[in-house]
Amino acid sequence: YLAAADSAMARTVALQSPCISYLVAFIEQAEQTALGVANQHGINYLRENPDSMGTSLDMLRRAAGTLLHLAKHPDNRSLFMQQEQRLLGLVMSHILDQQVALIISRVLYQVSRGTGPIHSVEFRLLQQRQQQQLRPASAEKQAASAGGSAPVKAEAASTETSSTEAKPAPAATTAVVNDENSNSSQQLPPAATFNDVSNSSTNSNSCGTVSSNQTNXXXXNSSHSSSAISSQSAITVTAPSAPATGATSAXXXAITSDQQQVSKVAAAAAAAAALSNASAAAAAAAAAAAASVGPPTSSSVSAGAAVAQPAAPPPTNAGTTTAV
């Protein structure tokens, strides 16, 4: 009965070495006893007194059923290979009960199927129960993993949005720094020309005029550069003050166009300053050339007159000459 209720128990029972051979021997012993009673007292006496064969029909049917349940397990079929001839002899017996012979024939059928992948009904039911028990556990694990991954995905999305929102401001600042650097680089040539002009005009009489012109030009350049830088700084202050979250492609294009216009204005101012410095340098050079070609100075004239005049004779005393 235990073997019939559970396929695992059937496997355990079948692994006992004398189990199958003992059950087959029990049925064979009953069949031999029944054959002796039939030969001695006749078949009718055996039918009227089935207990005369040493056991009851119920016990024989129970033993045959146990063999059938053991044979249904795929792993036990190899254990019945040695008992096939004995089982076939019981099936072909004309004395044994027909129901017992039918059960044994089913045992032979299960053994003939071999050790294939086909499992018994009990084994399939056990597998279904195990799968049903594993499914809720796997569903709970998947739900827990999904619940744990959802906040991580939300945090990753928030960090991505914050990084994209914070990116436009550094671009504007770098553009402003580049523009300021370009303006400062454009303002360098006037200072260099000022140094050259001041060095060339140190030995001329027009040094004061040139220096005053250069100081005026330097003041004009500084005012232009300060105005350009102030306008640039105003633009850079107003541009980043806008909220980075609302910046769109149109606003970025407007900021870049304004920066280009400011850079163009600064370049024009620097070019005008360079032209004014060049004109001042040309005027200083012309004044120096005129001074070198013109008449000599008063100091040189007085020196020449002193050299040309001869030495005057010493004064004489009128009284002395008359006395002599």
Curated annotation (Swiss-Prot):
Its main location: nucleus. Signal peptide: none annotated. Residues 179-188 have a biased composition (Polar residues). Pfam families: BAF250_C (PF12031). Keywords: Activator, Chromatin regulator, Developmental protein, DNA-binding, Nucleus, Repressor, Transcription, Transcription regulation. The keyword DNA-binding applies. Disulfide bonds: none annotated. InterPro entries: BAF250/Osa (IPR021906), BAF250_C (IPR033388). Component of the Brahma complex, which is composed of Brm, Osa, Mor, Snr1/Bap45, Bap111/Dalao, Bap55, Bap60 and Bap47. Interacts with Pnr and Chi via its EHD domain. This is Trithorax group protein osa. It comes from Drosophila yakuba.
